[in-house]
Amino acid sequence: MLYTTLLLAATAFSGADWPTFRGNAARTGASKADLAFPLTEEWVHSGSGRPQNAWPGPARHDLYNKVVNLTPRLWFDRAFYVSIADGRLFFGSSADEQIHCLDAETGEELWSYYTEAPVRFAPTVVGGKVIAGSDDGVVYCLRASNGELIWKERIAPDDQRLPGNGRMISLWPVRTGVVVSNGVAYVTAGLFPSEGSYVAALKVSSGDTVWKNNYKDMAPQGYLLASKDHLFVPASRSTPYVFDRRDGKRLRQLGGNSGTFAIVANDDLVFGPGKTGDMTEASGSGAQIASFKGQHMIVTRGTSYIHTTTELSALKREEFVSLTKERGELNKRRGELTSSLPNLSGADKSKAERELKRSAERLGEIEVAIRECILWRRVCDEPLDVILAGDALIAGGEDYIAAYAAKDGAKLWTAPVDGRAYGLAADDGKLYVSTDSGAIHCFGNPSEEEDSK
């Protein structure tokens, strides 16, 4: 695995609940919820149909650019991704156009709410409210207890429809989900750049607009992310955009690999995986910090976990950051010295040559030390998703899931599921798995749960 100047900033764990996609507004996929292995399947929900994807998978090869085995980049609706809060599980359905609520303990459906088009993204739950967007161009806010409508807001100014994926959808569908922070819900609407796309901030309490801006050159698709100051907007097969959360001003488009997987580490964004399976890390200011092989990443305060199509690995962050920073500075200095050599002579030239020799030796030492930053590396045949639950990494595969010890990568447990396990979530000692068959599996440890009562 090739790592190139990878700065991994610390990101806090989510709390006990999993109230939004990948647990929080940074989409870290990390939870404090401990799982007591071996887990037992407690229930399966499969009554909402099979996910109806907005886009087919990629062609196998890009012969023009000589790229084979293309990696999917638009993966946001391959399963019914779930949110969990206060003992209830919520998901949107692209099959039946509803927002569903299940009892997280039993899998019993408690209520559902019809929209007018597919709901492709997991809802966000905050303060007893469930907020979700639909392909009908509307953001819905429902009461978590009973599904009662509190407010709804159409983001675009008009209600125009057209056929899309065999359904009638808005000319401005909500294809980024909703991210909530400090009482404000951020959302986008739009898919066709020529028709304009809207980026908006709404008050969670009322749905009133805080700000709304229109852009004619972007196609927002993929889960929104938020840091302290910035809103990050994935842009389909293009690279993400950065917005100021205060007023919605678009600050820049990031360079690097495209794709709709992304996480925030402090104010850096890691995104990809690009069509070659490469990810990019960029700062909120736009500086590209890293490029590396990977499908998914989890960042914690001490260790970062990299998930590729074939491997799972752990990396010592602080040492790695220090070494890669030094390496970057040395390479920059070597470039300056090399450029200046033709213009030097005598003692100045000898001094520059000695510095180049010393820096080359130090770079060799740094490369060895960087390799030693890798705490462990394990073969992983489950490439579809990964989360961190307490001290275990859970990986999704085809028709099964697997758990690995975060401390050393040892395999702890496996279990079969119905379909490809694209969506994972953990809360209150339970693991929830969403697959491309439309199934949602719940795993728990009944003996541990009984002891805790």
What residue ranges belong to the model's regions?
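Noncatalytic, solvent-exposed loop/strand surfaces
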Residues: A12-K453
